[in-house]
Amino acid sequence: MKVRPSVKKICPKCKVIRRKGVLRVICENPRHKQRQG
């Protein structure tokens, strides 16, 4: 899980979702998981 000021899709399988007001990126590849900090 990377915590970043701006989250972006890294590959075509990444999805940007909003959970409890927090932007997150979920993906098949665990290295692509991100959260807006």
Curated annotation (Swiss-Prot):
It holds the Pfam family Ribosomal_L36. GO terms for molecular function: structural constituent of ribosome. One of its GO terms (biological process) is translation. Keywords: Ribonucleoprotein, Ribosomal protein. The keyword Cytoplasm does not apply. InterPro entries: Ribosomal_bL36, Ribosomal_bL36_sp. The keyword Ribosomal protein applies. GO terms for cellular component: cytoplasm; ribonucleoprotein complex; ribosome. Belongs to the bacterial ribosomal protein bL36 family. NCBIfam families: rpmJ_bact. This is Large ribosomal subunit protein bL36. The lineage of its organism: Bacteria, Pseudomonadati, Thermodesulfobacteriota, Desulfovibrionia, Desulfovibrionales. The gene is rpmJ.
